[in-house]
Design a protein with these regions (language model features):
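Anion-binding alpha/beta catalytic cores of soluble intermediary-metabolism enzymes, centered on
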Residues: 1-265
């Protein structure tokens, strides 16, 4: 199929077999530098993202798929949000709970906390906060055709016992989820959770308490396949689970599989 360049969204013919590139530069001469964060590249990213979200909000498009953003470029370009999910939720007027999902080989993960300092994590581990991603990942997986998904829940502390959060918050959240009919199991100690849940195929998904407890396992097992799904929004939005990979930019050696996987989801 041919790639056509258009200057407005209205020029796109969705019945055509061709692919369309929407040029939003409007004559601007952005000065990009390969493998280097710049104010101009950040502004360009935000402009494209804002337009995509606007089109989604107006029901003119059904989904958004994007390549990795460089967070430094976004900040230089004027982004004031802590992460992309917060930005997207705000622009789409979503007030309910949102959560970033990561996927490898149809194994999904969700987090209770995300981009916050480790020292702040424990205070956020409450029964109510744990139930939110459990409910959401169950809902989203069922929408993706996985009925009654087997949900593993990670512990917070080493061996699920060096602290009180498991007894006071995590186990009560798991028990409450079971009362709601959700197929939950845990808490699983973090250091073996991916072997039990993912490698041994005992679960379909896993909810973790903080960012690196999940991301380290995901990237160890499937860095070259991982997908990120922005959960809880009004439109499906996906990207790769890896970053912008400036270390290999321009070398023509990038692996396309993660981006293709994110597009398929």
């Amino acid at each position: 199929h041919e790639l056509e360049t258009v200057n407005s969204f209205e020029e796109i013919d969705f019945k055509s077999k061709n692919r369309f590139f929407l040029d939003i530069s409007k004559g601007k001469n952005y000065k990009y530098k390969i493998a280097e964060p710049t104010k101009e590249s950040g502004e360009s990213i935000l402009e494209a993202l804002y337009l995509s979200l606007k089109l989604a909000k107006e029901n003119k498009i059904d989904a958004i798929n994007f390549a990795p953003f460089n967070k430094t470029s976004l900040k230089l370009g004027g982004n004031k949000y802590s992460d992309e999910l917060q930005l997207m939720a705000d622009k789409l007027d979503v007030k309910s709970f949102c959560c970033e999902f990561n996927v490898i080989d149809n194994f999904w993960t969700a987090r209770v906390t995300s981009h916050i300092p480790i020292k702040e994590v424990a205070s956020q581990i409450t029964k109510e906060n744990i139930l939110k991603p459990i409910k959401l990942i169950n809902e989203v997986m069922e929408l993706n055709g996985i009925k009654n998904p087997r949900i593993a829940v990670q512990a917070l502390n080493p061996h699920a016992e060096f602290g009180t959060e498991e007894k006071d918050e995590i186990i009560p959240a798991i028990e409450e989820a079971k009362k709601l009919g959700l197929n939950t199991d845990g808490p699983l100690p973090c250091d073996t959770s991916f072997v039990v849940a993912y490698k041994n195929k005992n679960h379909d998904c896993m909810v973790g308490m903080y960012h690196d407890a999940l991301q380290s396992g995901l990237k160890a097992f499937g860095f070259d396949r991982g997908v990120t799904v922005q959960g809880g929004l009004t439109v499906p939005i996906t990207t790769t689970a890896h970053g912008s990979a400036f270390d290999i930019a321009g070398k023509n050696i990038a692996n396309l599989e993660p981006l293709l996987n994110s597009f398929k989801i």
